[in-house]
Amino acid sequence: MTKVLFITANPNSAEGSFGMAVGEAFIEAYKNEHPQDEVVTIDLFNTTVPAIDADVFAAWGKFAAGEGFETLTEAQQQKVAAMNTNLETFMNADRYVFVTPMWNFSYPPVVKAYLDNVAIAGKTFKYTENGPVGLLEGKKALHIQATGGVYSEGAYAAVDFGRNHLKTVLGFVGVNDTEYIAVEGMNANPEKAQEIKEAAIANARELAKRF
């Protein structure tokens, strides 16, 4: 059975978000096409996603020195445990669907924090004599991103840092089979917003058949 993580990073629901509407349309179609698969929703705004901070570095330092989990402070234990949960869930999945908005040329900070939780040496990638090697080969990912302007092509494509960063991190951990759906231009062309949304939903439903 294939396990799919539906990873969202938007405080708004599908009623208030173009990206979430497309994301939910995709996952509904995916479930219809693949009823045997398991879909797990991870709402990053309602999930504990520790940032790498002094507590985390201190905990890693203790582990490197051979000290056990019991030697950590309560705060360190809570953060490390949450990070380990996020990491294990990510490693045990086969497909990833990220749904994010663009905020000032990138995605919400919680997405970066989540990627810091799952891009871990010795777990999702390893160092070799020839450089780092991803350990999650054979998995697939989809990124659905909503942007007010047009960033998938043209002059602004270079500043689509969220899309580029996510693709880079996924490739780094071995997930090189990636798809992308742009839900874009709604603010630049408000009179076409509904048309843009409907076209993206149709694209998402079609992709769900072969994802």
Swiss-Prot record:
Taxonomic superkingdom: Bacteria
Cofactor: FMN
EC number in record: 1.6.5.-, 1.7.1.17
Signal peptide residue numbers: none
Cofactor binding: number and manner: Binds 1 FMN per subunit.
Pfam entry (one): Flavodoxin_2
The keyword Transferase is assigned to this record: no
MF terms (GO), sorted A to Z: electron transfer activity; FMN binding; oxidoreductase activity, acting on NAD(P)H as acceptor; oxidoreductase activity, acting on NAD(P)H, quinone or similar compound as acceptor
Keywords for the protein's UniProt record, in alphabetical order: Flavoprotein, FMN, NAD, Oxidoreductase
Catalytic activity: 2 a quinone + NADH + H(+) = 2 a 1,4-benzosemiquinone + NAD(+); N,N-dimethyl-1,4-phenylenediamine + anthranilate + 2 NAD(+) = 2-(4-dimethylaminophenyl)diazenylbenzoate + 2 NADH + 2 H(+)
Residues involved in FMN binding: 102-105
UniProt keyword Oxidoreductase present: yes
Root EC class: oxidoreductase
Gene3D superfamilies: 3.40.50.360
Subunit note: Homodimer.
Family: Belongs to the azoreductase type 1 family.
Function: Quinone reductase that provides resistance to thiol-specific stress caused by electrophilic quinones. Also exhibits azoreductase activity. Catalyzes the reductive cleavage of the azo bond in aromatic azo compounds to the corresponding amines.
Family annotation (NCBIfam families): PRK13556.1
Protein name as catalogued: FMN-dependent NADH:quinone oxidoreductase 3
Upper taxonomic lineage: Bacteria, Bacillati, Bacillota, Bacilli, Bacillales
Gene designation: azoR3
